[in-house]
Amino acid sequence: METLLKVLSGTLLWQLTWVRSQQPVQSPQAVILREGEDAVINCSSSKALYSVHWYRQKHGEAPVFLMILLKGGEQKGHDKISASFNEKKQQSSLYLTASQLSYSGTYFCGTE
């Protein structure tokens, strides 16, 4: 039997983001995967980005910090979850490779 994973993306708004009017936009809003499939979640802003924070929240639990990407930094990752930061496009992408059931949850980006 195939196991389906439901991965939701949402927007985590930081106080600093509100002050600077940099509400990030994530796409796609929802992804449904089978185990072993890959997915990409994008986080972009119309304003200059200096850092992007990625989090995952499982149902009924607090968000868990995944990683931070800084302006001028390289791609980061651990296990089969990685992210990149494209300064020119003002966008960060979170890559879920060979998805597992443990990847289920809501993914958030925060920006400054």
Curated annotation (Swiss-Prot):
Provide the leader sequence positions.
1-21
Subcellular location field: Cell membrane
Q: Ig-like domain: which residues?
A: 24-112
Quote the Pfam families the UniProt record gives. V-set
Gene Ontology BP terms: adaptive immune response; response to bacterium
Q: What is its main location?
A: membrane
What intrachain disulfides are recorded?
C43-C109
Keywords recorded for this protein, A-Z: Adaptive immunity, Cell membrane, Disulfide bond, Glycoprotein, Immunity, Immunoglobulin domain, Membrane, Receptor, Signal, T cell receptor
Cite the InterPro entries for this sequence. Answer: Ig-like_dom (IPR007110), Ig-like_dom_sf (IPR036179), Ig-like_fold (IPR013783), Ig_V-set (IPR013106), TCR_alpha_variable (IPR051896)
Entry keyword annotation includes Plastid: no
> Which residues are noted as glycosylation sites?
N42
Q: How does it assemble?
A: Alpha-beta TR is a heterodimer composed of an alpha and beta chain; disulfide-linked. The alpha-beta TR is associated with the transmembrane signaling CD3 coreceptor proteins to form the TR-CD3 (TcR or TCR). The assembly of alpha-beta TR heterodimers with CD3 occurs in the endoplasmic reticulum where a single alpha-beta TR heterodimer associates with one CD3D-CD3E heterodimer, one CD3G-CD3E heterodimer and one CD247 homodimer forming a stable octameric structure. CD3D-CD3E and CD3G-CD3E heterodimers preferentially associate with TR alpha and TR beta chains, respectively.
Please describe what this protein does: V region of the variable domain of T cell receptor (TR) alpha chain that participates in the antigen recognition. Alpha-beta T cell receptors are antigen specific receptors which are essential to the immune response and are present on the cell surface of T lymphocytes. Recognize peptide-major histocompatibility (MH) (pMH) complexes that are displayed by antigen presenting cells (APC), a prerequisite for efficient T cell adaptive immunity against pathogens.
* Record protein name field: T cell receptor alpha variable 30
Native source species: Homo sapiens (Human)
